Swiss-Prot record:
Residue runs in coiled coils: none
Keyword Transcription regulation: no
UniProt membrane topology term: Single-pass membrane protein
Organism (species): Listeria monocytogenes serovar 1/2a (strain ATCC BAA-679 / EGD-e)
Principal localisation: membrane
Keyword Transmembrane: yes
Bilayer-crossing regions: 4-24
Subunit text: Homooligomerizes.
Protein name: Flotillin-like protein FloA
Role summary: Found in functional membrane microdomains (FMM) that may be equivalent to eukaryotic membrane rafts. FMMs are highly dynamic and increase in number as cells age. Flotillins are thought to be important factors in membrane fluidity.
One GO CC term on file: plasma membrane
Length: 314
């Protein structure tokens, strides 16, 4: 009995230590103390109970305090519970602080919760970003395609990040403006000779309004000539006209063949009446026997000549 008591006490102590070190990240608490960040053991235990990963909150807080930011653990924990990226948000605040950009925690958290990369927004507001667009195709007034790829230099506007249109809207607006500008050009050679005229006209249209960016410049990266749409349409029209003409000619040919067959039928019918007419003429005495034989000789002579002529042609 004297040995059971100490064993039970030892087991309880071990269980207590296991539970304690499970609930309390002692290493993280020591790191916070050494960095002079006011985080108590009770706060860390409360995070565990609220299913918050303490390192996801305390480490960014240590980083923020070291950078000279005035943040509290409750702010970061609330942002974590709301589904925000605490580490990225703190990095954005540090970058803004060092670049002398006015950005408080509430605005940074709102940008992050809106689904935008707040750190990228801060970095882009400091160092402009270059967006390379896909190929846009415009058609000049002479019917020749001009294919253009542009590079848009933009700078993030922190004030318009939440509620402002994104990168896709900027690209779509620039594409529409490029196509419209090329369409206003009389000759495609005018665009090739002066490509800056496109970028200048496009930039004058205020395409950055209502977006999260300020457009600094729009430059032509690549330009090439596409198909001659007008020539293609002319060829298609000529082919269509030719098909119509061929159809009309085929119709006339068919009508001529039909008329020829009708005439041949009429000739055959007329030839069939000749013997009857000769018979009536002989009966009525209008044609003599000698006249009839004379006519037969003429017909035989004509047939012989036609036969000889056909043989010579062969």
């Amino acid at each position: 009995m004297t040995m059971i008591g100490p064993i039970i006490i030892a087991v309880l102590i071990i269980i207590f230590l296991i539970v304690f070190f499970t609930l309390v990240p002692v290493g993280l608490w020591i790191s916070a103390l050494s960095a002079r960040v006011p985080v108590g053991l009770g706060t860390l235990i409360g995070m565990r109970l609220r299913r918050v990963v303490p390192s996801r909150v305390v480490k960014p807080l240590i980083k923020a305090v070291k950078a000279g930011l005035d943040l509290e653990v409750n702010q970061l924990e609330s942002h974590y519970l709301a589904g925000g990226d605490v580490d990225n948000t703190v990095d954005a605040l540090i970058a803004a602080h060092r670049a002398n950009i006015e950005l408080d925690f509430s605005r940074a958290a709102a940008i992050d919760l809106a689904g935008r990369d707040v750190l990228e927004a801060v970095q882009t507001s400091v160092t402009p970003k270059v967006i390379r667009t896909p190929e846009f195709t415009g058609v000049a007034q002479n019917g020749v395609e001009v294919k253009v790829i542009t590079q848009i230099t933009v700078q993030s506007n922190i004030e318009r990040i939440v509620g402002g249109a994104g990168e896709d809207t900027v690209i779509a607006r620039v594409g529409e403006a490029v196509v419209s500008t090329v369409g206003e050009t009389r000759e495609h050679t005018d665009v090739l000779e002066n490509p800056n005229s496109i970028s200048k006209k496009v930039q004058e249209q205020g395409l950055g309004d209502g977006t999260a960016y300020t457009i600094l410049s729009i430059d032509i990266a690549e330009m090439r000539i596409g198909d001659n749409i007008k020539a293609k349409l002319d060829i298609e029209k000529a082919n269509a006209d030719m098909e119509v003409a061929q159809a009309a000619a085929s119709k006339r040919k068919a009508e001529a063949i039909a008329l020829e067959q009708e005439n041949r039928a009429a000739v055959v019918a007329a030839e069939a009446e000749v013997p009857r007419a000769l018979s009536r003429a002989l009966e009525e005495g209008n044609l003599g026997v000698m006249d009839y034989y004379k006519m037969e000789n003429v017909q035989s002579d004509t047939a012989m000549r036609e036969s000889i002529a056909h043989e010579d042609e062969k």
